[in-house]
């Protein structure tokens, strides 16, 4: 099956930030924070105790703190192309281990977004060079859900559904990790959530993944703790 996508030719006007302006903006940000809380940076400098690990896409339009309304120190963030959790990616695996075992986060969120360029690229029959091994993981998601996706006749709707299914599969990959299984067995934490951000209206959508159900199903095969269900 071939795919072609047309999201319109109109492009929003870009406000390109001037390099020097960045440092002026930083000064304003510091002043605003101090005006709100004189001890803001003193408290921020002590340590971090985030309750959330956020695994999201590198897309410049999707920033965790903004869409969640969070402050610095509240979210531990990892971002890559198409919010992937790949077992041989030492970067994301190190982040998960640190967040779960050291920071003791209570929630792990995998957040995708509609109109994701990484997912779109994976659905395009084209050699992407160095990106091929990375995008193959998204194509694997399509293969796992081929019947459902092929039954969707509208290409844009099919594309959005793949975004959602990719989030679900990455949540499953999080649950497969030893760090998550070990701590959950001891403390019933962390809980894994799957979200999608709709760029067109700014809404966060909870895919309402049944964590306990997924964990039980996964541990039938991926049980790393040597315990019986």
Which positions does each model-derived feature cover?
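Divalent-metal-activated hydrolytic enzyme cores
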Residues: 3-50, 82-103, 117-229
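N-terminal short beta-loop-beta anion/metal-coordinating cradle
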Residues: 33-74
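Short beta-strand segments
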Residues: 55-57, 79, 109-113, 193-198
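A glycine-rich, hydrophobic loop/mini-helix early in the fold
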Residues: 63-91
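Short acidic/polar active-site loop segments enriched in Thr and Asp
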Residues: 106
């Amino acid at each position: 099956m071939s795919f072609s996508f047309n999201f319109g030719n109109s492009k929003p006007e870009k406000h390109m930030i001037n390099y020097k302006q960045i440092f002026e903006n930083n000064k304003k940000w510091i002043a605003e924070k101090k005006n709100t809380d004189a001890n803001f940076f003193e408290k921020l400098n002590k340590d971090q105790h985030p309750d959330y690990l956020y695994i999201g896409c590198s897309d410049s339009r999707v920033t965790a703190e903004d869409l969640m309304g969070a402050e610095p120190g509240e979210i531990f963030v990892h971002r890559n192309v198409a919010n992937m959790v790949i077992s041989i990616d030492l970067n994301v695996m190190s982040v998960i281990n640190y967040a779960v075992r050291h920071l003791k986060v209570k929630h792990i969120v995998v957040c995708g977004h509609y109109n994701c360029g990484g997912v779109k690229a994976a659905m395009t029959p084209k050699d992407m060079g160095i990106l091929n091994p990375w995008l193959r993981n998204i194509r694997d998601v399509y293969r796992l859900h081929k019947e459902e996706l092929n039954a969707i006749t509208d290409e844009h709707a099919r594309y959005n559904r793949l975004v959602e299914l990719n989030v679900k599969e990455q949540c499953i990959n999080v649950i497969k990790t030893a760090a998550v299984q070990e701590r959950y067995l001891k403390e019933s934490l962390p809980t894994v959530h799957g979200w999608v951000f709709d760029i067109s209206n700014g809404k966060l959508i909870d895919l309402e993944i049944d964590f306990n159900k997924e964990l039980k199903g996964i541990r039938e095969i991926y049980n790393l703790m040597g315990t019986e269900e």
